[in-house]
Design a protein with these regions (language model features):
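Extended recognition/assembly regions associated with phosphoester-bond processing machinery
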Residues: 1-388
Length: 388
């Protein structure tokens, strides 16, 4: 690809050169590659070059022309099996209450974000979130909703990390004294998060996902946060009321009403951002749908997306079709339901969710595991519940 970044282009960070948002060009081409070699694909066929990215597992049907270019007649992506008939399994250790059928998603808590000191709205929203979970000082309608929450899942950046720290491995520089200040800020932010989660996980089961953003040198898939960061929560961690989970996060939750499980898949969103950078896709939900169609969460890895060098098995290759697929979003809430092919020619509905940024919108998302309905809840000055 003409615009693919290199180590030399990385010097743009040092000299303040404007950042390129899209690494695509009208002259980009497609090639089919396997262990035997590489051949160029005729893009005059019904193929949009810039809707593909490097690394997609795909089979092409066609033939070589006299110019040694492969003319495509048909193509097929990796087939993801649907194991939705597996024995139901719930991620909770204890027996859930019969009426608990809601999962609350909170994306980008961003504790310590500088904007908080200006108006205090984010801190107020976090306090209101605790009141909601504790069933404290809320009306009966919200109280009934709160009592039905089965689990709270924190996605994305739960603590704020200064951009100066994030870009140290990209050629940027920072003064030693500034680095010490920012490092202390991060430690203080994690201490605040520890205390906050100690309150929340005392009332409801909590899953805390990790995030690549703000973690330089971190590779995908990402291990859970270390327990040493949450000393106030050791008892809750041992009791499984606070779960430090990996990224991507894959789990099943049992529906008492349906007498079966729902399969969930979520990431912090960096894999989706990478796909949009290297393709003409501009909407996260479309990029998410593409990863399901391609059967791979991050086909660009390791070319332009850092992952561990696995040799025996690709952990980012999908082996099941999720009922719900979510990512940490940067803006407001977006969702849609798509239809995927399942084994035996059956169809399966999949709910896609780009979660709202809590630190700027003060919104969380409630997902009903019984009927797949979605509702927004606003933790601003006036706690409100809106059907999506």
């Amino acid at each position: 690809m003409k615009l693919k970044p290199s180590c030399l282009k990385g010097m743009e960070n040092m000299y303040g050169i404007s950042k390129i948002e899209k690494f695509i060009d009208e002259k980009d081409s497609l090639s089919l590659e396997d262990s035997s070699g590489r051949v160029k694909i005729d893009t005059k066929s019904d193929i949009n070059v810039n809707e593909f990215v490097t690394g997609i597992p795909v089979a092409f049907k066609g033939q070589l022309n006299n110019k040694e270019i492969f003319v495509v007649n048909d193509y097929l992506f990796y087939s993801v099996e649907d194991n939705s008939t597996n024995t139901p399994m719930d991620i909770e250790m204890n027996t859930p209450k019969e009426n608990q059928n809601l999962i609350l998603f909170i994306s980008n808590l961003n504790i310590g974000k500088p904007e908080e000191s200006k108006n205090g709205l984010a801190e107020s929203a976090r306090t209101m979130l605790i009141d909601f979970i504790q069933n404290n000082n809320i009306n009966k309608n919200l109280s009934d909703i709160s009592s039905r929450i089965k689990r709270v899942i924190f996605v994305g950046s739960s603590v704020y990390v200064n951009q100066k720290i994030e870009e140290l491995d990209k050629g940027s520089y920072i003064k030693a004294e500034d680095y010490k200040i920012e490092l202390n800020n991060i430690i203080n932010n994690f201490t605040s998060l520890d205390k906050y989660l100690n309150i929340v996980s005392s009332y409801v089961h909590v899953d805390l996902m990790n995030s690549i953003e703000g973690n330089d040198g971190v590779y995908f898939p990402q291990n859970p946060n270390g327990q040493f960061l949450f000393l106030d929560n050791i008892r809750n961690i041992n009791a499984k009321t606070l779960n430090l989970v990996e990224n991507p996060y894959i789990f099943d939750i049992y529906s008492n009403k349906l007498k079966t499980k729902k399969y969930f898949l979520g990431t912090s969103g960096e894999n989706i951002n990478c796909i949009m950078q290297y393709s003409s896709i501009n909407e996260p939900l479309i990029a998410m749908q593409k990863t399901l169609e391609w059967g791979h969460l991050a086909p660009l890895a390791p070319d332009t997306f850092r992952i561990y060098p696995f040799t025996d098995k690709d952990p980012l290759l999908l082996d099941r079709i999720p009922d719900m697929y979510f990512i940490s979003g940067k803006n407001d809430f977006n969702s849609k339901v798509i239809e995927m092919n399942a084994d035996g020619g059956n169809k399966k509905n999949v709910t896609l969710m780009e979660l709202p940024d809590f630190s700027s919108t003060f919104k969380g998302i409630l997902f009903n595991i019984d009927d797949d309905s979605i509702n927004e809840i606003n933790f601003s000055q006036d706690l409100s519940f809106n059907k999506s």
